[in-house]
A protein has these predicted regions:
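Conserved C-terminal portion of the radical SAM core fold
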Residues: 1-59, 80-89
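Terminal RNA-binding accessory module
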Residues: 61-174
Length: 174
């Protein structure tokens, strides 16, 4: 299966790609899982929401209990997937260090109320200090100073005047 990621990234400036992945679906083979790892590495996702399969009554998969993947195999695969996902997410986030991002303020951080939290237009979580409290919904420009797999750190540059027009970005689904 050829990758559409390079073409999509070439067509849309500053595109962020994310996905949801379930590990351990009934009947999943080692080959299936290996291919999942290859696709995740190839598509270079900015983020991936990863889950361990759990049976849901009333679904077709719930009737496939005879094909359940052993829990120890699922746990090992999930750990391997997390390594690939974290590596690509950190690399993509580190590439943003030094950039100035527009951030919509969501409020104070749960861990440190002196730090504000907000999101970029790519839905990247950003933690940054502000000399004064900012209201939820305020837009600020923030220079990215550091990166982790699930969020960015930054410093406040300026407040952004309320926008009179925002461009809607089309969302494609596979």
């Amino acid at each position: 299966m050829p990758s559409t990621s390079p073409a999509a990234r070439a067509a849309v400036d500053d595109l962020a790609l994310s996905t949801d992945i379930i590990v351990g679906f009934p009947g999943e083979t080692e080959d299936d899982f290996t291919r999942t790892l290859e696709v995740v590495a190839e598509l270079d996702y900015d983020s991936a929401y990863t889950f361990i399969y759990s049976s849901r009554p009333g679904t077709e998969a719930a009737t496939m209990a005879d094909q359940d993947v052993p829990p120890e195999v699922v746990a090992e695969r999930f750990a391997r997937l997390r390594v690939v996902v974290e590596r690509t997410a950190v690399a993509r986030h580190r590439a943003r260090i030094g950039r100035v991002e527009e951030v919509a303020v969501e409020g104070p951080s749960r861990k440190d109320p002196s730090v504000l939290t907000g999101r970029t237009d790519q839905n990247k979580l950003v933690h940054f200090a502000s000399p004064t409290p900012l209201r939820v919904g305020t837009y600020a420009t923030v220079r990215v100073t550091d990166a982790a797999s699930h969020f960015l750190f930054g410093e406040l540059v300026d407040l952004v005047a309320p926008a009179t027009h925002r461009t809607r970005i089309p969302v494609a689904s596979a």
